[in-house]
UniProtKB/Swiss-Prot annotation:
Basic and acidic residues compositional bias, start-end: 17-33
Function: Participates actively in the response to hyperosmotic and heat shock by preventing the aggregation of stress-denatured proteins, in association with DnaK and GrpE. It is the nucleotide exchange factor for DnaK and may function as a thermosensor. Unfolded proteins bind initially to DnaJ; upon interaction with the DnaJ-bound protein, DnaK hydrolyzes its bound ATP, resulting in the formation of a stable complex. GrpE releases ADP from DnaK; ATP binding to DnaK triggers the release of the substrate protein, thus completing the reaction cycle.
Protein name, as recorded: Protein GrpE
Species annotation: Wolbachia pipientis wMel
Subunit composition and interactions: Homodimer.
GO terms, biological process: protein folding
Stated family: Belongs to the GrpE family.
Pfam families in alphabetical order: GrpE
Keyword Chaperone: yes
Residue ranges of the region described as Disordered: 1-37
Keywords: Chaperone, Cytoplasm, Stress response
Amino acid sequence: MSDSSKEKKKKFADMVSRQKGDDQQSDNHKQTDDLNEDLNTLKERAVQLEDHLRRAVADNENVKRIMQKQISDASDYAVTKLARDMIDSCDNLKRVMEILKDGDPVHEGIKVAYQKIINDLKKHGIKEVDPLGELFDSNLHQAVVEREDNEKEPGTIVEVLQTGYTIKNRLLRPAMVILSKKSADCGND
């Protein structure tokens, strides 16, 4: 074999080798592009899953907080029905004390029993609402009638007919009240 044919064979082999290298490089680029695309898809999916996880954890915390509030409220307000019955009994004891004379031993006994019940109610978060002299608040009071009184601002509570009660800052029973109003002839002086 001559040098020129050896040289031609070598050039041909180099060309084939380069062609194979180009094909292999092209295949490598295609595989790299495919892998990058797969990687980006997986990254997007990971971001979505992380977002779903965050939302699920937040929802779980909200449900937990709501349940704790409901349990707390159930505990705080479980005595509501009993409390309503007890305040009716307190009203009856008050009426009896108003009828009996102050020095009467029965009056004193009822007064002690009444005070004991009121103190026990307070231990459970039940408080009296005695708004005498305050301005009317429809959230806490129930107006029964208006009475002419030019000395007080209209809407001022001048008499409490029935004491109101709250349980842990929630209205149990509104106070029944009489409100002041200006007399009709007040402006005709």
